[in-house]
Every structure is written in C-alpha cells, then in structure tokens.
C-alpha cells in the first residue's frame, strides 16, 4: 500500500500544475477524502507560477530552452517558496526543451534519482 504519511506527487507539464494545486490546496479541495498532504512534490517542465505557504517541499526541473514551461517562471516560484521556508530543489538543464521525460540519453539523465533523493530527505 501507499504510506499515507510519506507519499509524493509527481507531474510533468500540465500534470505538474495539477500536483502543485493539490499540494497547495489539499486533496479535499478537489473531492478527495483525505487531508493528508504529500511529503514532497516533483514537478517537471511547467509554467506554473502559483504557490502558497501550504506547498509541500518541491523538486522542479525544466529545460533551458523550454518554450512552454518558462524556466524563469519556475525559478521565480522556487525563490518565493524558499522565502517562505519551503525546501526547494530547482534545476535547469542546458540545451533541453519541453518534454524530455525520464531524460534518458540527454543531459537530464539521472534527474529521477535526484528527485527521489530529495523526496527521501523530506522523510527524515
């Protein structure tokens, strides 16, 4: 089963917006039955700018050449969240655009492992 105290939410592009909103507002705001928030959120290549003091610790990654998920929007969001004391890991990968997936064979290769380490750190 899923560890309800230590789960994480992952999303890419529009899916990253979904997990960010669930993190900020709680699952109940979207018809969920639990108020238990994720231990971490992992967001890949999204232009989501919203944030709140309720956001879970967040790992985010984007390609420097992303024309959809603007890296600067993601950078500003990460800085604002850090200012609220929320743990954040923000990564920009040179030479990549939108939709690099697992990063296999690209400069982003290994980002999934980095995200898992970030999540594990939040469970300590």
Regions found by a protein language model. Give the residues of each.
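Short, surface-exposed alpha-helical segments at coil->helix boundaries
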Residues: 20, 71-75, 109
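A broad, structure-centric signal for solvent-exposed, well-ordered loop/edge residues
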Residues: 9, 50-51, 68, 100, ...
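Primarily recognizes the serine-hydrolase "nucleophile elbow" in alpha/beta-hydrolase
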Residues: 1-55
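Glycine-centered flexibility sites
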Residues: 8-11, 15-16, 63, 95, ...
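Acidic active-site catalytic centers that drive phospho-/nucleotidyl reactions
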Residues: 3, 66, 98
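C-terminal catalytic histidine-bearing segment of alpha/beta-hydrolase fold enzymes
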Residues: 61, 82-124
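A structural alpha-helix within SAM-dependent methyltransferase catalytic domains
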Residues: 24, 75-78, 116, 120
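The feature captures the conserved acid-bearing segment of alpha/beta-hydrolase catalytic domains
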Residues: 32-92
């Amino acid at each position: 089963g899923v560890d309800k105290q230590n789960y994480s939410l992952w999303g890419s592009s529009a899916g990253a917006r979904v997990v960010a909103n669930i993190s900020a507002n709680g699952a109940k705001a979207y018809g969920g039955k639990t108020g238990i928030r994720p231990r971490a959120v992992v967001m890949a290549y999204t232009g989501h700018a919203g944030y709140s003091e309720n956001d879970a610790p967040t790992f985010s990654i984007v390609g420097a050449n992303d024309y959809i998920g603007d890296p600067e929007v993601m950078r500003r969001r990460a800085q604002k969240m850090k200012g609220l004391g929320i743990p954040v890991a923000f990564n920009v990968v040179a030479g990549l655009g939108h939709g690099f997936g697992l990063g296999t064979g690209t400069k982003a290769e290994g980002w999934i492992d980095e995200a898992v380490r970030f999540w594990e750190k939040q469970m300590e």
